[in-house]
Amino acid sequence: MTLHAYPLNAAPAVAVTGLSRAYGRRLVIKDLDLVIGRGEFVALLGESGCGKTTLLRALAGLDAIQGGRIDAPRRPAVVFQEHRLLPWETLWRNVSLGLPGANIRERCAAALTEVGLGNRLDDWPRNLSGGQAQRVALARALVQEPELLLLDEPFASLDALTRIRMHALVKQLVARHRPGVLLVTHDVDEAIALADRILVMRDGAIAFEHRAARSDDPAATRQGLLGELGVETDLETV
């Protein structure tokens, strides 16, 4: 993996050039280019096995790549589908993991307050609902003030109402902190609700791009994206 650091405030959140990744003889990502700007929210759709999570893991520095280049200011923050909280640590201690500098508890308290859990600093993960645990995971990511936030289907295991609440919270937090965001998801409606730009990945490459606009018809956008994913719908019956 080739990783080149930009000076802060002088570059996009991440720039990928000619990225390739293979498992054995199977090429999972093929000469992929991608730029995500500061404050831009990008959603990545695609069938299982198309390379979405492999791309996210490469951007996070969790997987090596065989070719290409990733330019980023510093290590990004990641929120996974599972919250990955340590059950033997309190909430604020979970948020503090890997956090450098002074005033750690105060900064963690502020982050937990942002996600609506400021009164539960010394509580334990076992006492949280699924949505609350994911809010702690978001606080843990954003307390780092990352230039790039990677979201790997973080709402997939939540019920419908909790997902809607989490969408609103994420939009609010991203607007406040202004990281570049890459959301990997299978949910077309989630992508439409959250993203400034929606990408469809197919066979290890970006096959389609949609840039959100105020004039967009959500139903038509949904139908177009489903078509790109190989799901044909009749707009009149949706």
Model-derived features: where do they sit?
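Conserved ABC ATPase signature
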Residues: 124-128, 132
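Conserved beta-strand-loop-alpha-helix hinge in the C-terminal portion
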Residues: 204-227
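Helix-to-loop junction immediately C-terminal to a conserved catalytic motif
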Residues: 60
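Hydrophobic anchor residue at the start of the ABC signature
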Residues: 138
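A short, proline-enriched helix->beta-strand linker immediately N-terminal to the Walker B motif
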Residues: 143-147
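The feature captures the beta-strand-to-loop junction immediately N-terminal to the Walker
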Residues: 45-47
